[in-house]
Design a protein with these regions (language model features):
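Active-site substrate-binding loop specific to GH73 endo-beta-N-acetylglucosaminidase modules
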Residues: 69-76, 108-358, 478-479
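Hydrophobic residues in alpha-helical segments
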Residues: 19-22, 33-34, 81, 137, ...
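A ubiquitous short alpha-helical element
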Residues: 58-62, 117-120, 165-166, 267, ...
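N-terminal accessory alpha/beta regions
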Residues: 13-140
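Extreme N-terminal leader/anchor segments
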Residues: 1-4, 21
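Alpha-helical scaffolds flanking conserved acidic
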Residues: 90-91, 146-147, 315-316, 465-468
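Flexible, low-complexity segments enriched for small/polar residues
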Residues: 3-14, 272, 276-309, 317-481
Length: 481
């Protein structure tokens, strides 16, 4: 169960991490992972330490994850690998798909430096600067969904991604008004085109502005700005309840008070039972099982926890992680790993000393996921969508690269099992956790080790253990989380 918990609430565990967690009772493990606010946030100070996952900078350039997108991707992969708050990064990844926002469109308008800051700026990197979108997902990802939704409505990256800066009272732009209902809260079938038009008018005037040294791309950033003159001050009527008394109309109010329209509307969305069940279902599929139909009783329990605790996401997670369904062995390996999850799990289980996060960037993209670059506002195609011929080839190539890089460390760790191919295969299958291999597959692995006379000598162990690792980590079975 421990390994299952570490895979689902984080990104699996290295052998050393697994040993440390094994010393704790299961309930303590879950509590520590869930209530991660008590854990250190010093993960970034380890960047550049040769004992951790490496990073690769542009030739002659310092590591600049707040202004260079490839460096930002490497930093996020580093955090997924080494953060003492793995659930924080896991939830950021979950919400990144939910509030799917792509870097390239934004960079085309403001340049790569400012676009990178919009996506994942660490505000400590530049005095007074705004947290990037992914940093906001870390900050608010397990708190009130109302707060999170309002933060996304005001987020500069989201504003440009869905053209909210063009949304004015004389020419309403419907993109955000539609997506906040269809994708971010209620779901399809729970709103009408009348609601879309009214929602667009709610957010008129939500815009952005540049702050800092405007002439310096490395010393400036974008932040939210409300433009009252662009706001539609008239009443907005919906087909569903906006207020607890059942009222469906946001009243007319002076444009200077127009942000209250958005607050009223967002509170209506988050308190709607359709939103509660939709978020509950998405969390269930992400943490429990996306292959079988969701358990209706647990979905109801999660939705009730949300509605009964001021729309708090952690309240849902607490119920979910305590549930029999989460711990049921029938739900182990019943999720398709997202490429980011697959890569980090492999790095943790195979090894990372001397390996660069940069070496995972192209393989991850070839597997179908480039961080900060979902294909569209719908996010990535999940589940079986991750399994394709090109994705399989990318996983096999990545597994070969990683295993080859770690061959000396792999051989050192496996030295106690070198007596026979059978023992080595047994060890490897227990270290690199999967849903299991058939007897035929296991025999094929043993035959691979015996392809030349087995001696267990150092050179042979290095070559064969790397090859065996490649076979397991590159196999389809390893994709399941």
């Amino acid at each position: 169960m421990l390994e299952h918990i570490l895979r689902r609430m984080g990104f699996a565990a290295s052998p050393a991490e697994l040993a440390a967690w094994s010393a704790l009772p299961i309930e303590t493990v879950i509590d520590r992972l869930l209530n991660y606010e008590t854990q250190s946030t010093d993960h970034d100070v380890k960047i550049g330490d040769p004992n951790y996952l490496g990073i690769t900078t542009q030739t002659g350039q310092p590591f600049s994850p707040n202004t260079l997108i490839n460096d930002a991707r490497q930093r996020w992969l580093f955090r997924m690998t080494h953060s003492q708050r793995p659930l924080e990064e896991k939830m950021a990844l979950f919400w990144h798909n939910h509030f799917a926002t792509g870097y390239t469109k934004i960079a085309g308008a403001v340049g790569q430096e400012r676009a990178t800051r919009m996506m994942d700026n660490d505000p400590n990197s530049l005095a007074g600067s705004e947290p990037g979108q992914i940093q906001k997902l870390r900050m608010y990802g397990t708190g009130s969904f109302a707060t999170l939704l309002m933060e996304m409505a005001k987020d500069p990256a989201m504003i440009y991604w869905l053209d909210s800066q063009l949304n004015t009272r004389t020419r309403p732009q419907e993109n955000f008004g539609r997506e906040i209902m269809e994708l971010f809260s209620l779901g399809i079938g729970n709103y009408t085109e009348q609601d879309v038009y009214a929602a667009a008018r709610v957010f008129t005037g939500f815009n952005w502005q540049i702050r800092g040294e405007a002439a310096n791309v490395n010393g400036s950033w974008y932040t939210y700005r409300y433009v009252a003159n662009d706001h539609d001050p008239t009443a907005k009527t919906f087909t569903f309840a906006i207020y607890p008394d059942g009222g469906k109309t946001i009243p007319a109010r002076p444009a200077a008070q127009g942000e209250q329209d958005a607050l009223d509307f967002i509170l209506a969305l988050v308190r709607n039972p359709a939103t509660a069940r939709r978020i509950a279902t998405r969390l269930y599929k992400f943490f429990v099982n996306e292959i079988a139909e969701p358990d209706p009783a647990l979905i109801t329990s999660l939705a009730n926890a949300y509605l009964g605790n001021n729309y708090n996401i952690k309240s849902m997670l607490r119920v979910l992680f305590a549930s029999p369904q989460f711990r049921d062995q029938a739900n182990y390996f019943q999720r398709y790993s997202w490429p980011a999850e697959y890569v980090v799990k492999a790095i943790k289980e195979v090894g990372y000393v001397g390996f660069s996060a940069n070496n995972a960037m192209t393989p991850m993209s070839n597997m179908g996921q480039q961080l900060y670059e979902p294909p569209d506002v719908n996010g990535w195609e999940l589940g079986p969508g991750w399994v394709s011929t090109s994705g399989m080839l990318a996983r096999m190539n990545f597994a070969a690269t990683l295993a080859g890089n770690q061959r000396f460390n792999l051989a050192r760790d496996a030295a106690a099992y070198r007596q026979s191919p059978e023992r080595l295969v047994e060890y490897a299958q227990s270290r690199f956790r999967t849903m299991g291999f058939s007897a035929t597959q296991t025999t094929a692995m043993t035959d691979y080790l015996r392809s030349t006379a087995w001696t267990g000598a150092d050179a042979q162990l290095q070559t064969r253990m790397a090859g065996l690792t490649r076979l397991i980590v590159g196999a389809g079975e390893y994709v399941f989380n």
